[in-house]
Amino acid sequence: MIPICPVVSFTYVPSRLGEEAKMATGNYFGFTHGAAAQYSQQPASGVAYSHPTTVASYTVHQAPVAAHTVTAAYAPAAATVAVARPAPVAVAAAATAAAYGGYPAAHTATDYGYTQRQQEAPPPPPPVTTQNYQDSYSYVRSTAPAVAYDSKQYYQQPTATVAAAAQPQPAVAETYYQTAPIALSLPVAPKAGYSQGAAQYTQAQQTRQVTAIKPANPSPATTTFSIYPVSSTVQPVAAAATVVPSYTQSATYSTTAVTYSGAAYSGYEAAVYSAASSYYQQQQQQQQKQAAAAAAAAATAAWTGTNFTKKPQFQNKQLKPKQPPKPPQIHYCDVCKISCAGPQTYKEHLEGQKHKKKEAALKASQNTTSSSTAVRGTQNQLRCELCDVSCTGADAYAAHIRGAKHQKVVKLHTKLGKPIPSTEPNVVSQSVTSAAVSKPSTTSSSTSGANGSSSVGASPSVKLLTSSSSLSTSSSSKASSMSSTSIVKKVTTPKITFIGGNKLQSTGNKVDDSKMSDSAKTTPSTAAQTQEAKIDPMSEAAQTLAALQSDVQPVGHDYVEEVRNDEGKVIRFHCKLCECSFNDPNAKEMHLKGRRHRLQYKKKVNPDLQVEVKPSIRARKIQEEKMRKQMQKEEYWRRREEEERWRMEMRRYEEDMYWRRMEEEQHHWDDRRRVPEGGYPHGPPGPPGLLGVRPGMPPQPQGPSPLRRPDSSDDRYVMTKHAAIYPTEEELQAVQKIVSLTERALKLVSDSMADQDKSKTKESDDKKEPSKERALKGVLRVGVLAKGLLLRGDRNVSLVLLCAEKPTRALLSRITESLPKQLAVICPEKYEVSCSLAEAAIILNSCVEPKMQVTITLTSPVIREENLRDGDVTPGMVKDPPDVLDRQKCLDALAALRHAKWFQARANGLQSCVIIIRILRDLCQRVPTWSDFPSWALELLVEKAISSSSGPQSPGDALRRVFECISSGIILKGGPGLLDPCEKDPYDTLATMNDQQREDITSSAQFALRLLAFRQIYKVLGMDPLSQMNQRFNVHNNRKRRRDSDGVDSFEAEGKKDKKDYDNF
């Protein structure tokens, strides 16, 4: 093994020695494309070069951001060398090198900064070596034996201006521009092996391996650089007149040295370094002219007393620098993810349709919102970030990853050193937006601010190609540039043209916390936030991936045949069902799972195969519109038929009401003409009829009041039931006739009794006694007759005969005897008149069909007035006649008068109220449970339930509302109860009901409410279900239960089946 001395100089391959000498004379340090770095190593006991002075270190290229301490990535393990620097520098460097395991010797290396980008492909960087800049252009010869330089001549860089090392460079142009003393000639194809004492580094592998070495801690003697150096000072270091350049920096930064073992890429490397040298030459001219003499003197004094020959023949010559060669252009389109060979190809690509389409698609995806403009189904797509394509499923994504296109892009990115995203599927998220795509640059160069942060903000779409795969130096450089507050100076970058991509991504590996300053801590935090933000989509991707992997099984394996060539190799696959061919083996299973193949399989092989139906949006809209029109048409016909039926029913009701009213009015005015003036002290009775409306009051509708047409099936059932329970015309005529005759007869009885009383008064001798009032003041209709609540089959009506005094048995007998005589006067028909002392009433029965009965109850307001009297006279002190009638019966008759008056005032004009009360009266007659419900309490409840609603209630809604009120427990013991509004003292109208009756009625109401909810109101009403007017609508009512049998109607079958359950209804 040949030991390698760490003090290594770089040289050119002597292809054109004359031009190289001339370039060296003109202070131009270029990089030849064919140069190779020569390395030698000395033994562990190599001579340490210790001189009292050190020479100035120069940056050959533009300084990127900061100087970086790189601890000899290719350094030997036991080499102890101090490279021509003062003692403190050597000590610090030795301490730095000793911090690494496996490097026990105090090996130092001049600091090199490699600002690297993850965006481009990495050609292997030159090994990190130290470099001495001497007064002469001869290579450094050590006194130690076994020092080999491969017989190559090494040109050392002459001393140049101190300030030249501090030229700023934009952060975007982060290439292999080194920031510390750097090798003048970088290798294109390095040696295959580097032999060292303790460790061996080989390049036999073709795969690129990136090893991040933890940077050492900075020492005070470490030469560091800032982007914006304010000044360059010369300071004496030792006793000798030695000039040491001091490079100021606002923040010391460190990055990770990168060790590569892999193939080199000569064309790209040469282009990068040539462009860098061009930039350096343009920026260093003036500074070199000003400080050339002083630097040369310092370099000469640094090597006095040594065995090396110094030839300063070129030190004081300041020839005009040679113009740099034109740097080549490197074109890469980040939108299409391809590289172009030259400017013409790149221009043609930018003008091509493929690039324009991809650029337009990228802009459209950025402008797309996450809601309305999103493409249907994008939320279920897996996206490959590397190729910028979306796959509809997990199988398609897996096939894409294995495909040739993806592998080609991976290979290109690997070559360019660009970051390769993970192959894990990325679920398309509408909230993730990319950076704006910049327009392709057509100029030869682009300018940006020297500050890294400002340059990134100015042109976020520009990406520079680097040969690195690690972005730790990139993030570090940006952090250092953000902390700098020096002069902002714009510079011109080499002619490297790019098209912008989505965003700049950086991921640092491990950064030593001790090397991080306060200003440099912002970038790692930003990178951490980026990583955290990237975790969430991946977790969502894992969740959505399971949803995308459907249970569809591939079918039709036998119909996909392999097509082979003459050699028997499978060249493609052919599907006989779909008549298609494909040459990708990964697409075979996908094709077998595809919807197109499954449809063909279902059509040609297995019709029973289930294939999901995905109609187009247009077909779906057409189908929905067709269904909507059909429903509208059916609804129109249904409403029209209901309106027609309702109109016919209302016409019949109106005709009946008209003729009934005409007859009642005729009878009323006939009676009025017969009654003398003042015959009725309380006014004439109202016209005979169901409602008992007086002429002075507004006419109240009798019978079914005209309502708005029903809107529901419940309304139809209620109105149908109401029509069924409403009295027939014959019954109404019979009631009207007997009531009218009774009223007329009672009027005649009153007149007869008054005449008799007058004759008796005249015969008496006592003239001082005032004449008494009529014994009978009037007759009034009460109960269902006055309220208009008569039902079909009702034969009993009630009248109240008001007396001037308390009714007595004598008065009752007198009226009973006189009434038949007066009836015979009015009509020839015979009526049976009887007296009921228990009821304090006279009962009148007709003898012809339909037989009707009228109950005439005697009462007097005096009985109630006595109860309300609160003077000195108490009820006990008032002397009643000995044969006075039942007091409670008389009070009940007075209460019936008040109830009739209240009903006419409050309930008669309330929509649906009379109809619902008739319905409930029928319910109370049919169902024994409801028979205990007091009629007056029922009327109060219905009126309160309907009047408390927000608006008019249809019959069906009103009935449901009443059942809801009862179901809520309003009549239960302990509830609010129903107070009588016609009584001054609080009185519960439900007081006559016991607890069991209350609970039974509440339970029955709840059961009825359930029947209403299930559209079985006909069971509550005790009627048969209505037949449909049109058979087209049977589908609407039969959707809950199918027919039990073909021969029996469904409603009839249900009636038979549920008859036992609904006997109560």
From Swiss-Prot:
Instruction: Read off the Gene3D superfamilies from this record.
Output: 1.10.1410.40, Beta Polymerase, domain 2, Classic Zinc Finger
Q: Which residues lie within the region annotated Disordered?
A: 114-133, 351-375, 416-461, 467-486, 499-533, 667-714, 752-773, 1032-1065
Q: Where is the composition biased (Basic and acidic residues)?
A: 667-676, 755-773, 1053-1065
Look up the domain of life of the source.
Answer: Eukaryota
Q: List compositional bias (Polar residues) regions by residue number.
A: 364-375, 519-532
Q: Keyword Repeat: yes or no? A: yes
Q: Where is the DZF domain?
A: 694-1064
Q: What is this protein called?
A: Zinc finger RNA-binding protein
Q: From which source organism is this entry?
A: Xenopus tropicalis (Western clawed frog)
